[in-house]
Design a protein with these regions (language model features):
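Extended terminal and domain-junction accessory segments
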Residues: 2-72, 183-225, 293-510, 516, ...
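Asparagine-centered strand-capping/turn motif at beta-strand->loop junctions
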Residues: 123-127, 263-267, 493-497, 502
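Acidic-aromatic/histidine active-site loop/patch
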Residues: 74-77, 81, 98, 102, ...
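Signal-peptide-cleavage-adjacent N-terminal segments of secreted and extracellular proteins
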Residues: 33-114, 120-122
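Short tyrosine-centred short linear motifs in exposed loops/low-complexity segments
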Residues: 116-117, 162, 170-176, 256-257, ...
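N-terminal edge beta-strand
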Residues: 89-115, 238-254, 456-488
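A cross-kingdom feature marking solvent-exposed beta-strand/loop segments within repeated
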Residues: 144-163, 284-312, 472-477, 545-563
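Aromatic/His-enriched, Gly/Pro-containing loop or helix-boundary segments
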Residues: 99-111, 142-175, 205, 297-300
Length: 621
């Protein structure tokens, strides 16, 4: 016989349940519900931790235009200050060149959303004879790996005069950007900001700044004119060919306030690192690649293409105008360029004095790890992530360990891998394998056993031509490495340091980007002579820092080895590649297959497919 409930229990229990239900209903009632009709205009808002995610709808119309045309710019080059603010007048470096625009904007639209908002981006390709995909740099896409935007890996390219709709969750807060992935360096100009903010209560550094304004974005890109000369653009603008011929990008601040600035180096055909500094001001570093770090104050920063840095600028100087300077690294003797912007206090009059650069004492460099740890040069090894290294990654060994040797091979005979007119028979590779894209997207394969026996490969299974010791044999295949879901992974990247490998004789650095994951930088070490690298250097790879920096893009210096670790928690096909279009599209890349097909999120049934087609055998009448 069950025990009889007391009168108190009979009354109190339902009352407690009723109170809990009432609280839940009140929270739901007061929390705005996502509206499927939301547009991008109402996604740029103060973020709140109790708010429902919004569905943010955008339309991207991609077109081919020209910079500084007479029709759009209306002869403004005769009076350069008239060019600023003219609709559809694209300044660039002041030269006439074909460019690619989104919604007739250059750079493309900046997307400002809150954490976990859902982006619905309808891409309309109006380019004649040019396909395109868009990659959402910094976003893991855990729910929608098919939206990663890697051609022939996660999707078919968006063909001319067709429309493709990307749907993804902005789950990774921070400073990011979207970009085209086509392998065409001309289309590297197709990019825009993707800023994912979080609520003030969840933002770890919110007390360190007063303002986080959309206009305080600094997006750098490398621009190459028709004559082959390169320069740096700041938000699509340059001072022009004749000094301050065109209006400089201006950032306004109010004396006494602290501002969060967001910097991204989006594209760089040369791969040349860039330094950034602001006269008379120090920079308080807050985050790298969207991942928060312990704050560190420096006077200047060096970064490579693909990287993002957030810093706080305190407007604590005299009311004036100050120079913001960006300059390519001294390593790049073939590309010695700089560009400027202006930091203006209290909307200072344009004729007021501009404070130029003074000597800078401390620098943060993400490029290399030489001369670190002192009071002058700070490297990635000197920064600390706010996220502790997981126990699964802190041991001597990991479940999976991969080594990639960056190589260049010369080919002869019929099997050649063409790059450009000056370099017809050279191919870049990882472990001697030049990545070749499949004829249909890997993510659309129906099962784990549906591989292409003639094209798929890994370090243990390669085509017959790859087995030869003859360097003249071309080893091209779809390089795929399988990794168990939730495995701890270690990647070692070896750079022998030959300058010509990097695609620029004066810049021996590579920079690699991993899709779908962030990784911890465990170690990066440069050697006087790469030939001295031995197993002893790599034998003990146990992390010595418990909160190594988290990144998705990393510079690989010459004559060095770099050790990265991550937990493979995101199932799908993820691209690991050199950052420049002319390298990743021509072999210096690999696909990491995380998990099995059953682990992958479902691809929509109507998802577009593509591939080879060979018609039936018949005779023409």
């Amino acid at each position: 016989m069950s025990p009889r409930l007391s009168w108190c229990e009979i009354v109190i229990r339902p009352a407690v349940v009723a109170v809990i239900v009432a609280i839940v209903l009140i929270i739901i009632r007061l929390t705005p519900f996502p509206d499927i009709k939301n547009t991008h205009a109402n996604c740029d808002r103060p973020c709140h931790e109790l708010e429902w995610p919004m569905i943010c709808r955008f339309q991207f119309i991609i077109e081919s235009r020209r910079s500084l045309t007479r029709k759009s710019c209306d002869h403004c080059w005769k009076n350069a200050s008239d060019c600023a603010g003219k609709k559809y007048c694209f300044i660039g470096d002041g030269s006439d060149r074909r460019i690619f625009t989104v919604n007739r904007l250059f750079p493309g639209p900046s997307l400002h959303v809150c954490e976990n908002d859902i982006l619905v981006v309808e891409v309309v390709n109006r380019l004649a004879g040019q396909s395109v995909t868009l990659h959402w740099r910094g976003q893991p896409l855990q729910e929608t790996p098919a939206m990663d935007g890697v051609p022939m890996v996660t999707q078919c390219p968006v063909s001319p005069h067709t429309t493709f709709q990307y749907k993804l969750r902005a789950s990774q807060p921070g400073t990011h950007f979207w970009q085209a992935m086509t392998g065409d360096t001309e289309m590297d100009d197709l990019f825009g900001a993707l800023i994912v903010r979080r609520s003030a209560k969840l933002e770890p550094h919110r007390t360190l700044y007063d303002e986080d304004k959309p206009e305080h974005l600094i997006y750098l890109s490398e621009w190459t004119s028709r004559s082959g000369q390169s320069t740096l653009l700041i938000n699509g603008m340059s001072a022009g060919k004749e000094g301050n011929f065109f209006p400089l990008q201006t950032y306004n601040v109010t004396e006494g306030k602290r501002y969060r600035f967001r910097v991204a180096y989006t594209t760089g055909h040369s791969g040349c690192p860039v330094s950034a500094q602001i006269s008379s001001h120090s920079l308080l570093i807050l985050a790298l690649d969207g991942q928060p770090t312990e704050p560190k104050k420096v006077d200047s920063i060096h970064l490579v293409p693909g990287e993002r840095i957030d810093f706080v600028l305190s407007a604590d100087q005299a009311i004036n105008r100050y120079t913001i300077r960006f300059k390519t690294s001294d390593w790049c003797t073939d590309l010695n360029v700089e560009n400027f912007a202006i930091l203006t206090y209290n909307s200072s009059h344009p004729s007021s004095k501009i404070i130029t650069m003074a000597s800078q004492s401390t620098v943060l460099t993400t490029v290399q790890d030489t001369g670190c740890g002192g009071h002058v040069t700070h490297c990635l090894s000197d920064l600390k992530s706010l996220e502790k290294l997981p126990d699964k990654l802190s041991g001597e060994k990991t479940d999976v360990s991969l080594t990639f040797d960056l190589q260049e091979r010369n080919y002869s005979g019929d099997q050649t891998f063409e790059f450009d007119e000056l370099d017809l028979r050279q191919g870049r590779s990882l472990n001697g394998i030049t990545f070749t894209f499949p004829s249909s997207p890997l993510l659309l394969r129906p099962s784990d056993n549906s591989s292409d026996e003639n094209l798929d490969c890994n370090d243990q299974k390669v085509p017959a031509t790859c087995a030869s010791d003859e360097m003249s044999n071309f080893c091209g295949c779809t390089h795929i490495i399988s990794i168990p879901l939730m495995a701890s992974v270690q990647i070692i990247i070896l750079n022998p340091g030959a300058n010509h490998l990097s695609g620029g004789k004066s810049n021996p650095n590579f920079f690699f980007h991993l899709h779908g994951q962030h990784f911890y930088l465990i170690q990066r070490r440069e050697l006087a002579e790469f030939a001295n690298l031995s197993e002893s250097h790599l034998k003990s790879t146990k992390p010595t820092i418990t909160n190594s920096v988290l990144k998705d893009t990393i510079s690989i210096p010459p004559k060095s080895f770099t050790i990265l670790r991550f937990i493979a928690s995101n199932p799908g096909y993820w691209f690991l590649h050199e950052g420049r279009s002319q390298l990743w599209s021509r072999g210096m890349s690999v696909v990491l297959k995380v998990g099995q097909r059953d682990d992958f999120p479902d691809v929509p049934e109507t998802f577009p497919s593509c591939g080879n087609w060979i018609g039936p055998e018949f005779f023409l009448a």
